[in-house]
Each structure stands twice: as structure tokens, then as C-alpha cells.
């Protein structure tokens, strides 16, 4: 995709937080503090944390041109904080701050899809804590990539349509229930094998 974008004269910026491979795409730039040549001091940000830092940098340069109010970027912290907690990166240094302030924004977030998802769980938005994200919200959002199409999670969180948001919240809730059923089945099967081996020994 990057090579094709280059052919079309497009500049591609890649954000990542995984250990880079030996060969990386020839993008305009790659933001990944795990690269050996990257001077950024904190290399434990999750993917959304890296993307949020890019957003802050872009706004620092283009705020007036884009007519973006000072401090608006804090409203993106709901997604950065949610991802930081759900991705289980170490909650220290910048991650700790992103998670802390992300929870504050998450409790006030106007995102329609998030509100619909919380309603499915009977979870009061104003009372969300770290465990809610890690064990309730995060698994439902992650179910999109594990059991279906990852773009569905984006569509849920980006939706501004009541019916669409409701449908995606239902869909992700169903996917998560299916995932839990599969995990329970796999655990049951593994236990049977272990018990059989124990009897044989």
C-alpha cells in the first residue's frame, strides 16, 4: 500500500509501537519510538498513544490554520487512554498520565458509539474506572479484530448516527459473547486433555 501511495505522489506517515522488522516500508516518515534511531525518550506507548502524540504535534504547528481551539486535543484522550489501558502497556511515565487523564475524558466523552456500548453493559459513564476498561469495554472493542473486522470498532467509536451506533454496539457485544464461548470451549477441551494425560501417567 505504501509503495502504491508513493507512486500516486502521496506522503505516508506510519505510526507504530511494535518492534520494527528488518525491512520497513519506504514511507515519508515512521513514528515508532522502538526504532533504534528514534530519540523519543518513552518507547512504551501503545499505538493510540503514538497517534495522539502525532495529533498534538500537528496541532502545535497548524492550530491557527485549522482554527482548532487551544486544548481541543485533550478530547482525543478518551481513545488514547482507553487504548493504553486495554493494550496493557506498563502504566508508568507517559502511559500513566495518558491513562489517568484519558479516564477523566472518557467519563465525559460525547462519543455516541461509546455511550451505546456502555448502555449494553449497564455501566454508568461517569463512574468508569481502569478495571471497567480493561475487563469490560476493552474486550468488546477488541472482539472486532479477534472475531470479525477491526474496522467495526472504528465505526462504532466514530459513529454520529443513533441507529448505526446501536447496531455496532449490538454487533460487538455479540462478537464478544461468541469469543467468550470459544475461549471457554478451548479451556474445557484443554482441561480434558490434561486430565487424560494425568490418568495415563
Q: Where do the language-model regions lie?
A:
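Short alpha-helices
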Residues: 26-65, 73-85
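Hydrophobic helix-and-loop "lid/oligomerization" segment in the mid-to-C-terminal part
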Residues: 9, 60-201
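Short, glycine/acidic-enriched loop or turn micro-motifs at the edges of active sites
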Residues: 19-20, 35, 90, 145
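Short acidic, glycine/serine/threonine-rich loops at helix termini
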Residues: 1-4, 23-28, 42-44, 63, ...
Amino acid at each position: 500500500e505504501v509503495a502504491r501511495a508513493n507512486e500516486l505522489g502521496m506522503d505516508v506517515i506510519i505510526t507504530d509501537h511494535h518492534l520494527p522488522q528488518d525491512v520497513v516500508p519506504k514511507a515519508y516518515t515512521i513514528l515508532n519510538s522502538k526504532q533504534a534511531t528514534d530519540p523519543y525518550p518513552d518507547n512504551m506507548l501503545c499505538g493510540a498513544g503514538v497517534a495522539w502524540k502525532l495529533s498534538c504535534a500537528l496541532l502545535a504547528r497548524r492550530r491557527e490554520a485549522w482554527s482548532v481551539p487551544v486544548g481541543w486535543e485533550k478530547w482525543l484522550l478518551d481513545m488514547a487512554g482507553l487504548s493504553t489501558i486495554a493494550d496493557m502497556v506498563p502504566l508508568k511515565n507517559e502511559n500513566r498520565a495518558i491513562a489517568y487523564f484519558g479516564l477523566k475524558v472518557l467519563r465525559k466523552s460525547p462519543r455516541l458509539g461509546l455511550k451505546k456500548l456502555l448502555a449494553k453493559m449497564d455501566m454508568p459513564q461517569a463512574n468508569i474506572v481502569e478495571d471497567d476498561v480493561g475487563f469490560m469495554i476493552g474486550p468488546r472493542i477488541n472482539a472486532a479484530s479477534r472475531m470479525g473486522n477491526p474496522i467495526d470498532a472504528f465505526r462504532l467509536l466514530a459513529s454520529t448516527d443513533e441507529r448505526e451506533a446501536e447496531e455496532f454496539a449490538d454487533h460487538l457485544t455479540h462478537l464478544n459473547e461468541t469469543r467468550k464461548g470459544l475461549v471457554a470451549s478451548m479451556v474445557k477441551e484443554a482441561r480434558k486433555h490434561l486430565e487424560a494425560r494425568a490418568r495415563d501417567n
